[in-house]
């Protein structure tokens, strides 16, 4: 385990709270544990906002959850629990980070989530000292998962390790689908960043989005209508939902306007 001073130094340079860096550090060790657990590495595919930070864009917004799609033949929750218990033991032996599983939930869809509470370099348990782990088994994966190296900046994680991850296109298509399911400002931010900053072309991801939406029972042709209906809610929660994940939050109105041209391009493409 690294010293508190290393956490505080990184936090100071990045202009974020030391507890945010500690959580990112613990997430890195959990990922290292997955890479060293044969069952988890073979059956879990890393996805969501955290994969953008830990695999594709090291300076990206921080994310506090770990999201995976299970790709094994049998979604055996007891086997998943057993594998995570082994991971917890391994991480403690290697780093002295204490982890424990809390608040397990199995949903009607069969999906499984729990929280990993932790004691890291900054010491004892406190508010928000946990990481939500969500494992879904009802997702359609459009593109083949890719084995990717995890990005790390911590002194005790210099060894390179990799796990299976969503392709960038898969992340985009699922983010578009997620907007139809929930109202999370991070989805809007992520899509804006990927289209506007990284130059991704929405037309390249339309077919994957359509398949993913239909798979969950949504009409992909209603995407823009759904987005427009949620504008006020996105705007209301824009700053408070993103404040813990980045130091400079772009203006919502600018983001909304710039995303508009991508939605228009999407609409023209599907006509």
Question: Model features per residue range: what roles?
Answer:
Residues 1-44, 54-60, 64-66, 70-271:
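Structured mid-to-C-terminal alpha-helical surface segments
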Residues 46-50:
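Glycine-rich beta-strand-to-loop/alpha-helix junction loops that act as flexible
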């Amino acid at each position: 385990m690294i010293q508190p001073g290393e956490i505080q130094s990184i936090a100071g340079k990045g202009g974020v709270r030391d507890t945010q860096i500690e959580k990112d550090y613990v997430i890195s060790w959990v990922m290292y544990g997955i890479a060293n657990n044969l069952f988890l590495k073979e059956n879990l595919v890393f996805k969501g906002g955290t994969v953008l930070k830990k695999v594709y864009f090291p300076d990206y917004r921080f994310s506090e959850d770990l999201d995976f799609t299970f790709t094994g033949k049998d979604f055996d929750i007891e086997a998943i629990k057993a594998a995570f218990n082994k991971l917890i033991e391994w991480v403690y032996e290697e780093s002295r980070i204490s982890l424990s599983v809390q608040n397990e939930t199995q949903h009607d869809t069969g999906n499984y989530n729990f929280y990993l509470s932790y004691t890291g370099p900054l010491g004892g348990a406190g508010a928000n000292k946990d990481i939500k782990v969500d494992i879904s088994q009802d997702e359609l994966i459009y593109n083949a998962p890719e084995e990717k190296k995890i990005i790390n900046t911590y002194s005790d994680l210099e060894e390179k390790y990799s796990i299976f991850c969503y392709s960038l296109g898969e992340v985009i298509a699922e983010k578009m689908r997620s907007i139809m399911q929930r109202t999370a400002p991070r989805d809007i931010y992520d899509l804006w960043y990927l289209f506007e900053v990284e130059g991704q072309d929405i037309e390249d991801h339309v077919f994957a989005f359509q398949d993913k939406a239909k798979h969950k029972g949504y009409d992909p042709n209603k995407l823009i209508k759904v987005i427009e209906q949620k504008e006020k809610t996105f705007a209301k929660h824009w700053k408070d939902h993103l404040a813990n994940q980045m130091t400079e939050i772009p203006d919502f109105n600018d983001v909304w306007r710039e995303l508009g041209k991508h939605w228009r391009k999407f609409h023209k493409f599907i006509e």
